[in-house]
């Protein structure tokens, strides 16, 4: 550059004193001096004001005493001397192109980023955002599948038309299985049998294997096929019945002539033992009470009767006790202690809680009703119900499927029911029809009831002590019975004490003579106290104890206040 502009070239080494002095003189003559300091990595321009002296402007451009001219000044030093960093934007780069600032090469930035990860974001000014991925679903178009082409007049075409029309096609071999696709139908036809499936228990024939499995589970309780000499294990049988009960909600009797169904395993097993047997066989199965001879057809009924009526004493001798009652022996403990009344009440409440837990486990199951003995059915009479033909029943069932309700067929009656059984019960008591039904009658007290639920509630509440089953309705009657027994025992104790007192008064000894003089008040109090102590002591003794003869009794004279005189 020319000396007229006052530009001073930056030298790598220290400048001599004369050269520095000449530059100061040239810079003082110019109104505005432009000073450029070059370095290997940075370049900037310093503007000067006219008010500043030449010495001050020159001192800002020249290097410090021993440091080279290419020394890079700090930003704090530039701010203190009113040097703007934006002035560097007017300086041309090494290639002659003006740039805002010289950036570091890529290699140095990578090294800085390794040491300081946040530095890279500061250099670029903002974080790098991930590129938005295009949605593949938006680009792809939905291609509608063309209907498969089948030969004209073929079976596949007929099946396809039937699927389009009805939604499914049935198997031409068994006519019991339907499929929604032709591939599924072909796969089924490979395994489909033309022969019918036959039930091994009742001989009924069905077309599908699934129908046969349901038939065996519903009608035969999934009874396995037994060979000659094989027996059913009791735990496995209970597990099998439990699975059937969970799936269907009830257990049906397997006899063809019996249509009974049960909602508990215990009730079902109790029914199976007696179903189909004659009166003679049932008579042999009865269990009679050893004390009163009352017959019971279940162990639980006899056990409850013995606990409530005869107490926890042994009801059979050791040698004559039958095998069926050995497992429920109610003898006293090894110590010989008889069960207390409070323990009996506790056992009763425990049984009540256990029955409540069973009812919670299966809400629809009538556990207590299944345990009722057979003679309970004879405690009340049922009136005759009207009979209906199969056509009428089929019509009612179809009406329920269509309209979900049935109306009473009698003229003038607007009763509506959602089940056939409800309509049957209503027709037995409907007064607008031609059928005249009787009433339910209790055989224990000859009381009549309109509904079956009424007579059952009456038997459970009034005649509850006759049953071994503990129902929630019998709780109050049982508590009353226990209170009455407790009062009777207390009255008997009072009567015994009264009798003992009367006997003591009669047994007063005639040899005791009272003094002629009237005793003082203190003597009378002592006599009364001694007399009361004597009564209490005798009342504590057993009333059956024999009285002591008078000749062995010691005669005690009453105490007096008179002092013995000297003879």
From Swiss-Prot:
Alphabetized Gene3D superfamilies for the sequence: Classic Zinc Finger
Signal peptide, first to last residue: none
Keyword terms of this UniProt record: DNA-binding, Isopeptide bond, Metal-binding, Nucleus, Repeat, Transcription, Transcription regulation, Ubl conjugation, Zinc, Zinc-finger
Cross-link (Glycyl lysine isopeptide (Lys-Gly) (interchain with G-Cter in SUMO2)): 18, 84, 227, 333
Disulfide bridge map: none
Compositionally biased residues, Basic residues: 119-130, 495-508, 556-567
GO terms for MF: DNA binding; zinc ion binding
ZnF C2H2-type span: 197-220, 287-310, 406-430, 440-463
Biased composition (Basic and acidic residues): 485-494, 523-544
Intracellular or extracellular location(s): Nucleus
InterPro entries for the chain: Krueppel_C2H2_Zn-finger, ZNF512_C2HC, ZNF512_znf-C2H2, Znf_C2H2_sf, Znf_C2H2_type
PANTHER family attached to this UniProt entry: ZINC FINGER PROTEIN 512, ZINC FINGER PROTEIN-RELATED
UniProt protein name: Zinc finger protein 512
């Amino acid at each position: 550059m020319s000396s007229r502009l006052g530009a001073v070239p930056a030298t790598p080494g220290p400048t001599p004193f004369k050269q520095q002095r000449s530059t100061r003189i040239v810079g003082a003559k110019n109104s505005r001096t432009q000073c450029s300091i070059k370095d290997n990595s940075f370049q900037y321009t310093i503007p000067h004001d006219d008010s500043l002296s030449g010495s001050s402007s020159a001192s800002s451009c020249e290097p410090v005493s021993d440091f080279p001219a290419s020394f890079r000044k700090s930003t704090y030093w530039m701010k203190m001397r009113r040097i703007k960093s934006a002035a560097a934007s007017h300086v041309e780069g090494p290639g002659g192109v003006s740039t805002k600032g010289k950036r570091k090469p890529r290699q140095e930035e990578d090294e800085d980023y390794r040491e300081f990860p946040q530095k890279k974001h500061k250099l670029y000014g903002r974080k790098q955002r991930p590129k938005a991925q295009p949605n593949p679903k938006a680009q792809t178009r939905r291609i509608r599948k063309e209907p498969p082409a089948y030969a004209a007049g073929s079976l596949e075409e007929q099946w396809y038309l039937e699927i389009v029309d009805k939604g499914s096609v049935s198997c031409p071999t068994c006519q019991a299985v339907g499929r929604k696709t032709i591939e599924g139908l072909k796969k089924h036809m490979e395994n489909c049998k033309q022969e019918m499936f036959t039930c091994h228990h009742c001989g009924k024939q069905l077309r599908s294997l699934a129908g046969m499995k349901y038939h065996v589970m519903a009608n035969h309780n999934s009874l396995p096929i037994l060979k000659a000499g094989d027996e059913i294990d009791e735990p496995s049988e209970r597990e099998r019945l439990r699975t059937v009960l969970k799936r269907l909600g009830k257990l049906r009797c397997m006899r063809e002539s019996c249509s009974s169904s049960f909602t508990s395993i215990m009730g079902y097993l109790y029914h199976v033992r007696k179903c189909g047997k004659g009166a003679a066989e049932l008579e042999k199965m009865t269990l009679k009470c050893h004390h009163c001879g009352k017959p019971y057809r279940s162990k639980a009924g006899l056990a409850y009767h013995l606990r409530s009526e005869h107490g926890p004493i042994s009801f059979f001798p050791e040698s004559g006790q039958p095998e069926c009652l050995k497992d429920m022996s109610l003898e006293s403990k090894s110590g010989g202690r008889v069960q207390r009344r409070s323990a009996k009440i506790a056992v009763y409440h425990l049984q009540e809680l256990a029955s409540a837990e069973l009812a919670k486990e299966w809400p629809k199951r009538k556990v207590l009703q299944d345990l009722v003995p057979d003679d309970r059915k004879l405690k009340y009479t049922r009136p005759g119900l009207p009979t209906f033909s199969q056509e009428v029943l089929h019509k009612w069932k179809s009406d329920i499927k269509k309209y979900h309700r049935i109306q009473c067929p009698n003229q003038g009656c607007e009763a509506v029911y959602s089940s056939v059984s409800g309509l049957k019960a209503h027709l037995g008591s409907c007064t607008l029809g031609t059928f005249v039904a009787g009433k339910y009658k209790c055989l224990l007290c000859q009381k009549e009831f309109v509904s079956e639920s009424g007579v059952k509630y009456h038997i459970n509440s009034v005649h509850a002590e006759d049953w071994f089953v503990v129902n929630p309705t019998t709780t109050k009657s049982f508590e009353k019975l226990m209170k009455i027994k407790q009062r009777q025992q207390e009255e008997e104790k009072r009567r015994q004490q009264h009798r003992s007192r009367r006997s003591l008064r009669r047994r007063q000894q005639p040899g005791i003579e009272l003094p002629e003089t009237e005793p003082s008040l203190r003597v009378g109090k002592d006599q009364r106290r001694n007399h009361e102590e004597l009564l209490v002591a005798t009342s504590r003794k057993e009333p059956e104890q024999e009285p002591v003869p008078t000749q062995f009794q010691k005669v005690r004279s009453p105490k007096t206040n008179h002092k013995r005189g000297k003879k």
